[in-house]
Amino acid sequence: MKATGIVRRIDDLGRVVIPKEIRRTMRIREGDPLEIYTDREGEVIFKKYSPISELVDFAGQYAESLYKTCGFPVAVCDRDSVVAAAGISKKEFLDRKISHEVDLLIEGRSLYTAAGWNEHGSESRVPLTEDERSAMYLVCAMPIFTEGDVIGCVAAVAPEDAFRARTEKGELETEVKLIQTAAAFLGRQLEA
């Protein structure tokens, strides 16, 4: 574990302030749930909690079913990384940090569909992950809501060459409905 050299005191209500630099680096937002662990050496460990982690196997099976039925690659993400995928290399994408653009889409709390080409003649693409070598782009994505909170998203994705063909047609109705259904279903599973 890397030592940061920052010391904080606990206030009379038992609160500890996590420095802004650490929150920014670890992508900890206001209101994010944290798990608290202790060990035998007297350490207190804070770990980001992802509600989707309870459904990783289930989300993977759902993504696999969508891929087999409809033929488009699917990724399920929490607020930080890709947690399940089908139709794309799991080794290449699982546990990879989502791109800043995907994070903003999740924050936006609404359906995203790729626009294809913009008015300047250039393509507007949203990469799935931060890794430029793994060129996979969102065709459509829907945030997953549970009890009013956004906890991630389900996305139909495509590699660079297939992205243009899929978005130029403008016929994304099927993908959109299936992705919306998947997001709603996974959200309901977490509420149950």
What does each model-identified segment do?
Residues 73-86:
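Short hydrophobic alpha-helical segments used for membrane anchoring or interfacial signaling
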Residues 63-74:
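Short regulatory alpha-helical segment in sensory/regulatory domains of signaling proteins that mediates
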Residues 14-26:
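Short beta-strand-centered segments at strand-helix junctions
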Residues 56-65, 96-99, 152-192:
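Juxtadomain coupling helices with adjacent low-complexity linkers
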